[in-house]
């Protein structure tokens, strides 16, 4: 079986068009990552329907958390932790195969009161996910140039992805992820977009060696191609 380890975000408008793409390119199985449309509307029901109408073992769904929880339980770590576990359990019971977290994308953290990942509010979720061996597809950070006004590309800037001092720093988010893994080394994490370490392959290699359950996916932004092409021998050695 040939594998390409990437992800796509799913909404109800994608079904027929996605079927055509899968047939054209011979995609036998896929995983749909659910993030809220327009920031708040869940795509989980649509993705589960798509899964239900296709043969077993050909479609998998990573369900997204409800963003209302960040406001409903703001300042109440115990209630939030309990809610996150309940939500995740309900997603699996409904037919999801894992959890999609976009909560590490900096503009999401800028717009929603999401606690730091290594604080008590998240601890019940990480503990549950580790004990239950739940796959988590986690978007953490963005390309490092999004914090540099002189390097960010015009498209990213037009999308609101320039991050100034009011937005969490990428290294601070990496610190939080490393702290979570230090406490929960058995977490089955798949870190999206090569963890935005395509320009730091030795650092990524060290992370993967230390935590055997951690994976990265190859869903590319432009920066991934550019960074890997900047040192082709090193990139080839990493993948080999």
Describe each region flagged by the PLM.
Residues 1-2, 159-162, 183-190:
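Short, surface-exposed connector motifs at secondary-structure boundaries
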Residues 3-8, 29-33, 59-64, 99-101, ...:
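Hydrophobic faces of well-ordered beta-strands that scaffold small-molecule active sites
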Residues 12, 172-175, 179, 188-240:
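H/E-rich (His + Asp/Glu) clusters that bind or coordinate divalent metals
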Residues 16-21, 46-49, 124, 202-207, ...:
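A short acidic, amphipathic alpha-helical/loop segment
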Residues 21-22, 91, 129, 180:
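Generic structural signal for hydrophobic
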Residues 44-161, 166-168, 222-223:
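Active-site gating/metal-coordination segments in enzymes
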